[in-house]
Amino acid sequence: GYLKNGISEALKSVPADKLIAGVPFYTRLWFERPKTDEEFAADEGTEAENYPNKVKSSAYGMDDAAELISSMGAQTEWDDKTKQNYAQWEGDGGVYKIWLEDTQSLEEKLKVIKENQLAGVAEWSLGMEGSGVWDLILQYVN
């Protein structure tokens, strides 16, 4: 995943005992829909003119994201590339996509941090973590 690659790169110039990895307690919900003719016209001459879709996102805490997926009747599946659960559903003229930060994805990150014997882990944003997160962190970090 991305964290593993980032740590590998950082370790080329920073000793493991000086490196702290940051992990998120939030996830982003992405919404993508085709651009209108007006939006294409407004984007003319900019880099955005090359993209056929309008994209926006919003942040959700771990528990809120799980509730949202459930309320939409969507199913999650494991994305081995990102090491996250993923869901998508259609609505409002477009597609909603979410790669979840949850205890499963967090554990994958903590395994990489422990394997590389890093100095520690930093989490953000406090208050957005799901239940069971701190017990999981204590299993991997002293």
Regions of interest found by a model, annotated:
Residues V23, S125-L126:
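Active-site proximal loops enriched in glycine and acidic residues that flank catalytic Cys/His/Asp
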Residues K81, V112-E115, G127-N142:
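Aromatic-rich peripheral "rim/lid" segments of glycoside hydrolase catalytic domains that contact
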Residues K12-A16, E90-D92, K114-N116:
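Extracellular/periplasmic catalytic domains that process cell-envelope and extracellular macromolecules
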Residues G1-K35:
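Active-site region of glycoside hydrolase catalytic domains
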Residues A21, I113, V121:
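Conserved, mostly hydrophobic/aromatic
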Residues V23-V112, V141:
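Glycan-binding loop/region signatures in secreted carbohydrate-active enzymes
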Residues N5-S8, Q104-E115, D135:
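Solvent-exposed, polar/charged alpha-helical surfaces in well-ordered, non-transmembrane soluble domains
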